[in-house]
Every structure is written in structure tokens, then in C-alpha cells.
Amino acid sequence: MAFDPASLTFDANGLIPAVAQDHATGEVLMMAWMNAEAVARTVETGRVTYWSRSRQAFWVKGETSGHVQRLIELRIDCDRDCLLLLIEQEGPACHTNRRSCFYTALREGEERIILDPMV
């Protein structure tokens, strides 16, 4: 069956959450938003493209930083309202220069930084 981005369930703003996960390690790297066109561009090019809510523009991950995300597999959840992007990540995924945006853990009621910036 051919994939059609219009078959996904987008929110009132026309967006769907997309979680990026390292295809080899399973590490969750980041979450961002996509609209139907960003999904289509990602599938067509293999370069992950998000929708920047703050800039109201397409954001090709790594276009300016060089920290490219290559799509290995796109998975759709059971309600078709969330995407899992299995990717190959070049360099850090987070704008803080960390491998993952999920670098703060809650441990014993305290926030702890668990990932240092990559050098």
C-alpha cells in the first residue's frame, strides 16, 4: 500500500509530533514537529525535515550545523497521530551540542544533567 502523508492525523495547527531515535542504538535523540509537506519531503529525500513553529518555516536537520539526520525508517503509531523516525545521526542532535535533547533526568526528586556537550 502506497503511503500518503494526508492519511496521518495532524493537530489543529496541521502538525504531528515526530520522535527521532538512533536506528542502531535505540537512543531517543529529539522530538520536533512536522506538517504534511515536511513528512513528504523527508520520505522523498531521506533527509529529515521538520516544521519550525517559531520560524514558521521548514527546517532540514543539519542544513546549517552539519548535524544531518538520515531517515532509515519511518514508523506510524496506532492512532496515526505520532511518528517515530529511525535515523542515522551525524554529530549531536541537540542544539546544545549534546547527542540527545533528553539530557536532563529526574532522579530522587532532583534534576540531573546526564549528558555533556559533545566536543
From Swiss-Prot:
Superkingdom field: Bacteria
Q: Name one GO biological process term.
A: L-histidine biosynthetic process
Q: Which InterPro entries match?
A: PRA-CH, PRib_AMP_CycHydrolase_dom, PRib_AMP_CycHydrolase_sf
Give the co-factor note.
Answer: Binds 1 Mg(2+) ion per subunit.
GO cellular-component term (any) = cytoplasm
* Residues at which Zn(2+) binds: C78, C94, C101
Q: Which cysteines link up through disulfide bonds?
A: none
- Write one Gene Ontology MF term: magnesium ion binding
Q: Give the catalysed reaction(s), semicolon-separated.
A: 1-(5-phospho-beta-D-ribosyl)-5'-AMP + H2O = 1-(5-phospho-beta-D-ribosyl)-5-[(5-phospho-beta-D-ribosylamino)methylideneamino]imidazole-4-carboxamide
Q: Which cofactor does it need?
A: Mg(2+); Zn(2+)
Q: Which Pfam families match?
A: PRA-CH
Keywords per UniProt: Amino-acid biosynthesis, Cytoplasm, Histidine biosynthesis, Hydrolase, Magnesium, Metal-binding, Zinc
Q: What is its main location?
A: cytoplasm
Q: In which pathway does it act?
A: Amino-acid biosynthesis; L-histidine biosynthesis; L-histidine from 5-phospho-alpha-D-ribose 1-diphosphate: step 3/9
Annotated function? Catalyzes the hydrolysis of the adenine ring of phosphoribosyl-AMP.
Cross-referenced NCBIfam families, in alphabetical order? PRK00051.1 (NF000768)
Protein name in UniProt:
Phosphoribosyl-AMP cyclohydrolase
UniProt organism field: Cereibacter sphaeroides (strain ATCC 17029 / ATH 2.4.9) (Rhodobacter sphaeroides)
